[in-house]
Amino acid sequence: MTSFLSHAKINLGLQVLNKREDDYHNIQSCFVEIDLEDTLDFSQASSFQLSVDDADIPIDESNLISKAYRFIRIRAEKVQTEFSIHLKKRIPIGGGLGGGSSNAA
C-alpha cells in the first residue's frame, strides 16, 4: 500500500475571469495550504475500487476521485495496472477548503 496526503487550502483571493467554450471559467487564485489533510491509500486491485471512511461521501461516478480516475484511464489506455483507493476524510465536506479537488489531484 502507498499513502498520499491531500492538503486543504484557504483561498486568499479569487478572481473569476472569462467564460470558456466548455462552460467553465478561467480563474486567478491565490491560496495557502493549511495543516489539515485527508489521506489516500492506494493498493493494487483487479479493478478500480473507491472506499471512504465517511458514509456521507458518495463513492459513485460523481466523486471527483472517480472522475479523475476515468480521465486518466482514457488517456493512459496502455497502462494495465488497476488499484483501489481508500480515502480517510479529515477535511470538512463543503467547508470551502478544497478537499474534494485536492483528493482528485
Name every feature range the model reports, one short phrase each:
Residues 95-105:
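DPxDG-like acidic metal-binding loop motif
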Residues 1-94:
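ATP-binding N-lobe of GHMP and related small-molecule kinases
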